[in-house]
Amino acid sequence: MHCAKSGDSLSTTIIHLLALAYGVPFVMVGIEHFRDPQKFVDIVPSYLPFPLFLVYLTGLMEIAGGLGIIYPETRIMAGRFMVLFLLAVYPANFYMWTNDVPFNGTRLTTNGHLVRLFVQFLLIVAALGFSGDLQKIRRN
């Protein structure tokens, strides 16, 4: 995905469209952290302090990461940031799974949690692609 520096305008356009498709949902979910924080507070693991603060912080990070992916000038750094961010927030998803915590009133089945884990993995791989690091890993 890092081929945006090449002169190929079609591949550059595709990269920009993929970046929009990846970044916009993160921005939207990040905004939702501020519009309805309680549904996110409910999934913060009980062992973490200051759940409302963490919800606002992760919302801000999702907005920043999503925007960073969208803009070519910040895409490499944002891709690396998103890898770390997605790894850092997965414990909330795991907490939901192991404690049967509903999100916004919905409890996921084991299969639902497995799908969510797989999607998290795909989001990390995509972030590695946007950063250019996936191509480096594949070359080695």
Language-model segments: residues:
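Membrane-interface extramembranous regions
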Residues: 2-140
